[in-house]
């Protein structure tokens, strides 16, 4: 899975965990399913997990899920690449049969959601544009999680850096945040600042769309062109036809050029240049 990041895979620390394997079910194992409302109901004691033979493996899976969470938290991991369709790790579906959704979230998926993990569906990493979208939001999420906000100036600077990305993902919520910031009373309230930080992080967990990505790319490119006078022939208008690899190349070119000219690329405001 990590090889899909190419040379960038070394920019991350990988900690493979599988709650089903850590439960002791082994590989290969009998398929399991949720008997009840959802994986969250399993955590609440109101549903069970059974394998194909009808054996109750609820306790085993819960032990595997707890062991996985402990391993991730011990390593200070806050992003997780999950397999959609799994009754344990699935977030929005817990089966791969036909077009059914199953009973989401899965048991481990519910635990990850409750702990505000940055969640990346493994299948999305096959698309160069979706992979770019997850990567840029992950970098912004990690920065937003760790950056110090100890004054009103810090808070305004924090929002200035992430606001364009937040507006792309969820314009309504981003506009509401901007309005609240403009109406802040005098002084600095740490609790309110942390609430805003959390709101931003929750926005950054959401994927964008291809249409939004292309439109924002063009908008930022036109700003960059006016500011620097530099033309990038490979960056095309939103309505121009091209494949996903070309779009991803445009996005990465915009990142690289913005970084070298010190012009903020609002669609990807946090760029990581290696450890």
Spans of features found by a protein language model:
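Extended non-globular C-terminal regions
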Residues: 191-275
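Charged, often glycine-rich, active-site loop that binds/positions anionic groups
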Residues: 28-46
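Glycine-rich phosphate-binding loop signature in dinucleotide/nucleotide-binding domains
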Residues: 72-76
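Short Gly/Thr/Asp-enriched flexible loops that form oxyanion-binding sites at enzyme active sites
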Residues: 85-110
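Divalent-metal-activated hydrolytic enzyme cores
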Residues: 43-67, 101-193, 203, 207
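Short catalytic helix/loop segments, enriched in acidic residues and glycine
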Residues: 1-16
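Short connector loops at secondary-structure junctions
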Residues: 15-31, 122-131
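Short beta-strand segments
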Residues: 18, 81-85
